[in-house]
Design a protein with these regions (language model features):
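Exposed acidic/Ser/Thr-rich ligand/metal-binding surfaces
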Residues: 1-194
Length: 194
């Protein structure tokens, strides 16, 4: 019999009444706002990201990048999760419109070149349909290039909703970068699941 490689997921649960202290984290939300993302899906995404940012703690840092054919960053680097920065982020997310082409590589590249703090988990949430229309179009090349440039600095979690998703690309991008992917079957579920 041949040995097969396998993978498993381990969930560690503390004893009841002995909660683990939360770790500080550096989180970036990379939001695909191209025309392939219908406005209803983009609105759900913005609400989910805003709610996620509101849940960040004072010792967390965050950033947002909205990408189409070019990226637009909320801030040039990660910022502290102060109430002032959270309010500014809500303003940044307000009214984003679905338009233009999709360059997934250029949307994520500036984020993986930001430096997370030493000893602090770096997390990127990519919210996209995983269907590039500009830049690197080949899924394998896109995943390999981003993974090589990331150098395990960030865990990448991919998220989407609806039925028009390249789940293969999102799954492999997350897997190769120590993350997970999740596709909400209905667009209306995106806000809650994110």
């Amino acid at each position: 019999a041949s040995e097969r490689e396998g993978y498993f997921r381990l969930q560690i649960v503390p004893k009841e009444g002995e909660a683990l202290p939360p770790l500080p984290k550096d989180v970036t939300f990379a939001i695909d706002a191209s025309s392939s993302i219908i406005q209803r899906k983009l609105d759900q995404t913005a609400r989910g990201v805003q709610r996620s940012i509101q849940g960040l703690r004072d010792d967390d840092r965050f950033n947002i990048v909205i990408f189409r054919d070019t990226p637009t960053l909320f801030q040039q680097d990660l910022v502290s999760a102060t109430q002032q920065n959270k309010a500014a982020a809500a303003g940044f997310l307000k009214g984003i419109q679905s338009r233009g082409e999709t360059d997934v590589y250029e949307g994520i590249r500036p984020v993986i070149h930001q430096t997370p703090r030493t000893g602090v988990p770096g997390i990127i949430f990519v919210i996209s349909d995983g269907r590039p229309t500009e830049g690197i179009l080949d899924g394998r090349t896109l995943i390999n290039t981003l993974t090589d440039e990331n150098q395990s600095k960030y865990s990448i979690y991919a998220f989407s909703g609806g039925r028009t998703v390249n789940q293969h690309l999102l799954d492999l991008l997350a897997y190769r970068n120590k993350g997970e992917s999740n596709v909400a079957p209905q667009i209306e579920e995106m806000n809650q699941q994110l």
